[in-house]
Amino acid sequence: MWPDGICRVTDTRYTKTIQYQDINYQLSQNEDKTAIFEAWCDFLNYFDSSVQFQLSFVNLSASQETFARSISIPPCGDEFDGIRAEYAGMLQNQLARGNNGLIKTKYLTFGVEADNLRAAKPRLERIETDLLNNFKRLGVVAAPLNGFERLHVMHDILRMDEQEPFRFSWDWLAPSGLSTKDFIAPSSFEFKTGRQFRMGKKLGAVSFVQILAPELNDRMLADFLDMESSVLVNLHVQSVDQVNAIKTVKRKITDLDKSKIEEQKKAVRAGYDMDIIPSDLATYGAEAKKLLQDLQSRNERMFLLTFLVVNMAPTRRELDNDLFTVSGIVQKYNCTLKRLDFQQEDGFLSSLPLGHNGIEIKRGMTTSSTAVSYTHLDVYKRQL
């Protein structure tokens, strides 16, 4: 991690992170929803196949002291101090009642492949500028995170059971011989069993969402973030080169047509109507042709999506209850929740806002099927 916010994840992969706020998508009128949706589709189409990005939605509990500091209004020694105190008290009461002590943040992490930092830095800065301009056109408040802020985010996730303030300075590294990892690492990790893990005093479980529906429902993400518990929701998205995507779909259509011809030959030999073919072939053929039309004429791109959910809880019972809740949410939208058996460590690492995806479970989706990343604007937000 460097002070400017660039992080070297592997020997050749460098990433940066942008924190962004939400917009009132769920509360908007249908016309406004359509405009927001189309603008977000254009936002996603900006990414080419060389840029993999990660959308992170983090719900973490915070101490009352943290909330109190964030909304405190210091007195100024004038006749309005009474109003300031009353207003701060009202904010604290509303905050404690409104979100059950949860801080909800959203991040976009993007990365490029490069031989060294010198080659990666100008590309990352150009992409960052373009993304900030795209956010601005969407009417979304966004800001890039520097190295200290990215470490702070990681500290809050990895040490969520301690709720201690993040203490770090770049000047401390050389004299102490420590690295940035020493300031954010939890007290312990334990990946003994294949279906859950322990981080500090908390138990966790990493699952992936198996997307069976043709597209993601715009309410599913909102339901995840409305849970009153610590949860990390991550979408790893990799754009597929448009030419390769069209070639792949055409090959699939050719394979389906070949299978259809074979079935028709069987029908003729068996003496029944050759138009009677398996329903799956007819369905898949029509869907493949529709997908090809979307890619060629509707400004759609193909994306490979990995959908990960991390639940954290202090006890096994609470963790099981949270997993049951998440499973109910995904089933409501024609998806299934699958535990990452013996991949908990890789799954948790892929759920940190680092832009690294170590889970090779991907689902092909089009632009419009992927664009579900807005819910509603919270009244309270941490300052960007």
Describe each model-derived feature in a short phrase.
Residues 1-374:
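Extended, folded cores of ATP/NTP-driven motor/assembly subunits in large transport
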Residues 375-383:
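Conserved small/polar residues in nucleotide/adenosyl-binding loops
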